[in-house]
């Protein structure tokens, strides 16, 4: 006799309730919002302006988007960085004595491992390799030391070999001991960027220093007894990390020493649910491959890039805001805004087969930077980089009436000096987190500090003549319309 399992009654309501809990993040038109603001981060998730999806870059993202759960911003920044690496050390924009080549670093930050950060690279990689099969050998991972990074793009190494005559050394001759790397392009994709940050904490590790060198110049070297060096290096790095891992592993040293501001920080989340995966055929990308081939050939035959008059006018209008930036931790990670925007604009121009940065190229670059800046605010914005300032801000959040300096001192049980409190308040004022208000009294006005009603976003407050609805004001409008559509 065969025993049959007892029939199990399916509780559809219970299953539905459990599913709603698991997918409690708002889902609209098949989209997911993995990265809902946490208790410590009340800023809205960044919105990518349509301005950023200009030209070939936008065409590629829109072609891939229906077939992936990846975030459009992650697709876009990796396409731009990959293109800039693929073309090599050719086109550049000159600022004084400095040349900005098309090297772009980025870190894609997901609220969790479900943000589909890794998925965002696979389709971009497939497209780039179709254009240049040799680029496959340029793609590296496993960053752990500065010497290791240099080794991949190292120069030829020689040693002095003694020449003897009748047993006596009469001269020395250079002998090649290492032919070096013929390929000077390196595109480092790090799906576990937390490991990179952990490696940099080891005593004597040179990775942070070399990464900074690689962004600044084409000459890489470390001061060791038997140094390996590289010239003409063209290195770009893209990392993937979760927000928790980033906050845990990016210490104050790396934020302050210029490591963090050589990266574009990109918030990413799952864009949609595709239970059966995507279905992007090779033929779907044929037109993108053709256009990208043209852009690559053009870029490899281009040297100096310039701005036209219209783009230059907009650049003059946004330059002060980009240069001034922010204070505190947010300022530390976004302080190379001008250089990042220049490189982004160059990439949009080259993708358009132009050696002139036109208005639309600069607008696209500014839209990407706006997203990077908003991402940095979302990730780092609640921390000023000053523990005293952070505690004061928390105290002010709990006091609608605000607090005077005396009350703030009492909050610390007078364990903080007036100088420390003054410096912390100044940091919060610079970040526009708080405002200073004078309240009338019978005698001397009372100075009170309160949380700002609205966070100031100077990048969208730049005054542009009423007759010219361009630049960051129009980018802000585009963002607003995008928000309405979502």
Predicted stretch roles:
Residues 3, 10-486:
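Phosphate-handling catalytic cores of nucleic-acid transaction enzymes
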